[in-house]
C-alpha cells in the first residue's frame, strides 16, 4: 500500500515534472499501432477493488485531472464487502477518467490446483474467473476493457495463450517499460507502493527507457 501523503507526493511530481498521464487502454493501443506517445508518457494503475482508492486516491487524481485504471476482483464487490468499492463509486470515478478492468472474481493463485481438483476442473475454474468479470464489468459499467492483471502476477504459457486468443492484454507484476516489442500477454509495470514508494526510486523508474534485444 501507499499512504495518502506518499501518493500526493507522487502525483505532484508527475504534474510538476510535466509527465503526460494517459488512459492505459489508449496508451497501449497507440504503442501497438506504432504511434508515438507524448514525451514522458505514463499510465497509473491500481490492483484490487479496495475502497480506499475511492476515499483517498480518487480525490487526489480528480484534482489533477489524471486518468487511471483499477484492476478489480469482483467477488468482494458483489458480496457488498465494505472494504471494497461499490459499483456506484466506480461509476462516479468513470466520469472523471477512471477505467475498470479484469483482476478475476476471487483473486486466486491461477497456477495452483485446489485439493483434489483435476487439471480439467482447474482450467474451467480459471477461465470462468476471467470471463465472469468481463460480464460483470459490461453489465455494471457498460464496458469491459480487454485488459487483465494476473493475481499475484502469476501466469503460464497456457493462460497467456488463452488471454491472447480472447484479445486481452495481460499484466504481470515484474518491473519494466512497455514498448511495441513487449509481450502483450504479460506486460510489466513498475510498483510504487510499500517498499517501492520512495519518490527517489520512483523518479528513476519513471525516467526509464526500453532496451530492446536484437538477434
Cite the ranges covered by each PLM segment.
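Metal-dependent polysaccharide deacetylase catalytic core of the NodB/CE4 family, i.e.
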Residues: 1, 17, 32, 37-42, ...
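A cross-kingdom marker for long, charged
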Residues: 155, 175-208
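Conserved beta-strand termini and adjacent loop/short-helix elements that scaffold enzyme active sites
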Residues: 24-27, 71-73, 103, 173, ...
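Acidic, His- and aromatic-enriched active-site or binding-groove loops in soluble protein domains
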Residues: 46, 167-176
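Short, electropositive alpha-helical surface patch
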Residues: 154-171
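N-terminal pre-catalytic segment of deacetylase/amide-hydrolase enzymes
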Residues: 1-42, 189, 197, 204-215
Amino acid at each position: 500500500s501507499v499512504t495518502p501523503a506518499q501518493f500526493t507526493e507522487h502525483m505532484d511530481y508527475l504534474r510538476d515534472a510535466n509527465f503526460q498521464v494517459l488512459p492505459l487502454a489508449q496508451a497501449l493501443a497507440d504503442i501497438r499501432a506504432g504511434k508515438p506517445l507524448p514525451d514522458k508518457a505514463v499510465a497509473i494503475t491500481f490492483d484490487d477493488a479496495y475502497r480506499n482508492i475511492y476515499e483517498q486516491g480518487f480525490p487526489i487524481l480528480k484534482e489533477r485531472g489524471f486518468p487511471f485504471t483499477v484492476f478489480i476482483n469482483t467477488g468482494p464487490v458483489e458480496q457488498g464487502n465494505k472494504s471494497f468499492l461499490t459499483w456506484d463509486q466506480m461509476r462516479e470515478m468513470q466520469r472523471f477518467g477512471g477505467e475498470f478492468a479484469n483482476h478475476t472474481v476471487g483473486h486466486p493463485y491461477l497456477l495452483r490446483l485446489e485439493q483434489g481438483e483435476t487439471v480439467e476442473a482447474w482450467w474451467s475454474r480459471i477461465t470462468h474467473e476471467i470471463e465472469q468479470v468481463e460480464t460483470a464489468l459490461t453489465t455494471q459499467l457498460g464496458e469491459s476493457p480487454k485488459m487483465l492483471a494476473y493475481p499475484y502476477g502469476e501466469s503460464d504459457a497456457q493462460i497467456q495463450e488463452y488471454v491472447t486468443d480472447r484479445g486481452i492484454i495481460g499484466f504481470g507484476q515484474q518491473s519494466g517499460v512497455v514498448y511495441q516489442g513487449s509481450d502483450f500477454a504479460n506486460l510489466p509495470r513498475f510498483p510504487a507502493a510499500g517498499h517501492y514508494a520512495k519518490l527517489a526510486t520512483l523518479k528513476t523508474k519513471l525516467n526509464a527507457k526500453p532496451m530492446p534485444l536484437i538477434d
